[in-house]
Amino acid sequence: MALIIRIDVDRPYGKSPVGRHLLSRLSSDLWFPRINSFGYLKELQVILEMLNKRNARSYLFFRRCTLPSERIMQLIDDGQHQIGVHLENSRSFETFFQEKQLIERHTGKTVLALSKHGSGTARYGYHHYAPYEPDRYIDWARRSRMKVFFGNLEDPSIRPNSGVNGFMAFPSAFWLEPDWRDTSLFPVDWLLSEARKSDVVLLLHPENVLEKPELAEEFARLVAELPTKILS
């Protein structure tokens, strides 16, 4: 049994300082070029380097504004990570499929994993459709011959659902950031114990983890002590 690492790549330029936060908003709502010298996906690069040193694999979920640069793609290939769609415009199957095709064209890879940007409480950007409707996403993923859906619930004890042709749906995750986790019920030690008995999804956002040294230390500990897994 193992840790299934899910990384949601939400912000192209992070959220601090203020200038990079503004570039992230501009990229999300309108357009801004991918400029490495401005720190494009800088936090993701750090996380991937940490993972690759440990031979730990992960799922990386990209938005239309966080498409991987050449440098990030090299780290992805080196670590054999999997690319997924972090769905924004979930109004219809057609809008979902457009985002899937966008990421596949950009990366040159078949995308087999799906997650949803936001949990239904707020709208995050011009292209974002806020309602959270996991049953629809699971149906779309199956129709598109994808392999796995990762949901946004916050109770990591909820078990995954398996379907036809090996499709898997994980309704919930262990959110590394404590704002989305009941830390009294699910401390990091719970995850260390549980992931030795069953597969558990660990969800994180690079800019949030690296912003707080204690989260970065917890992440490093988890990757060092637990095996990681990509679903075949």
Residue spans for each PLM region:
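Catalytic alpha-helical scaffold of carbohydrate-active enzymes acting on polysaccharides/glycoconjugates
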Residues: M1-M168, T183-L202, V209-S232
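Eukaryotic low-complexity, charged/proline-rich intrinsically disordered regions
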Residues: W175-R181
